[in-house]
Swiss-Prot record:
Post-translational modification: Glycosylated.
Example of a GO cellular component annotation carried by this entry: extracellular region
Locations listed in the record: Secreted
Biological processes annotated in GO: defense response to virus; negative regulation of translation
Taxonomic lineage: Eukaryota, Metazoa, Chordata, Craniata, Vertebrata
Class in the EC hierarchy, top level: hydrolase
Function of the protein: Manifests poly C-specific RNase activity toward yeast tRNA, elicits a dose-dependent inhibition of cell-free translation, inhibits formation of superoxide ions in vitro and inhibits the hemagglutinating activities of soybean lectin and Ricinus communis agglutinin 120. Inhibits HIV-1 reverse transcriptase.
GO MF annotation, one: endonuclease activity
Family: Belongs to the pancreatic ribonuclease family.
Organism: Bos taurus (Bovine)
EC number: 3.1.27.-
Assigned keywords, A-Z: Antioxidant, Antiviral defense, Endonuclease, Glycoprotein, Hydrolase, Nuclease, Protein synthesis inhibitor, Secreted
UniProt note on tissues of expression: Milk.
This protein's name: Glycolactin
Amino acid sequence: SALYALYDFSPPARKMRAYTVRAYVHGSYSRRGPWYDFEPVPGASMDGL
């Protein structure tokens, strides 16, 4: 949860944030998280959380 909050403070870095969250939170066991699609797509956002 802390990781989500930390990266959510950088609106301009949405794409990078998507990459990071996917890699550190779900990259080890799934390409998609339980709350959001972590694929690093343009305009990606964690608002789905």
